[in-house]
């Protein structure tokens, strides 16, 4: 809960926060040390959303959060659909981190693309179908955004700091 406390303090002071949820185990993945299963990244987003809804930052503006997930994460479809219910994750903007590998898969007829976590392939999907789902969701719900993450990191002057994503608000960038 230390990160949630840090997030609350940042938002209380008027700041915005970006999170990369790609490093959280996919839903249903085994957690050996606990002999349990992961609830997945989207469930963790709910915790941070509750913090954001609770904190009114400097004045009446609520905190701003951006949740990102790599396009190759096994829970990417759940992430894309997470905000279709207007009552869910209202303290978040969400964006998909699109990789060069995904864009290359879109250029092929088969569109084969692997969803992976910690070098384990969970599923091979059709990149064309996933791209269509991203675009339809963006058209219908105005989310997710698309971040060409490899290009961003390639052009990043602070590449050695491993910066992955940016702030949800242009003035906080």
Show which residues each predicted segment covers.
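Extended, polar beta-sheet/loop recognition surfaces of beta-rich domains
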Residues: 173
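Conserved, charged catalytic cores of large soluble enzymes
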Residues: 24, 33-47, 57-160
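Conserved small/polar residues in nucleotide/adenosyl-binding loops
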Residues: 165-170
């Amino acid at each position: 809960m230390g990160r949630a406390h840090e997030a609350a303090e940042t938002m209380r002071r008027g700041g915005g926060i970006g999170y990369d949820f790609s490093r959280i185990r996919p839903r249903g993945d085994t957690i050996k040390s606990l002999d349990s299963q992961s609830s997945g990244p989207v469930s963790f987003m709910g915790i941070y959303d509750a913090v954001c809804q609770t904190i009114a930052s400097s004045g009446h503006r609520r905190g701003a959060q951006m949740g990102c997930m790599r396009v190759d994460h096994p829970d990417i479809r759940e992430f894309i659909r997470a905000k279709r219910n207007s009552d869910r994750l209202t303290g978040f903007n969400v964006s998909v981190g699109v990789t060069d590998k995904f864009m290359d898969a879109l250029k092929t007829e088969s569109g084969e693309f692997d969803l992976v976590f910690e070098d384990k392939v969970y599923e091979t999907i059709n990149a064309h179908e996933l791209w269509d789902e991203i675009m339809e969701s963006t058209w219908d719900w105005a989310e997710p955004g698309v971040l060409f993450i490899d290009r961003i990191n390639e052009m990043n002057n602070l590449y050695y700091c491993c910066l992955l994503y940016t702030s949800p608000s242009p003035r906080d960038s």
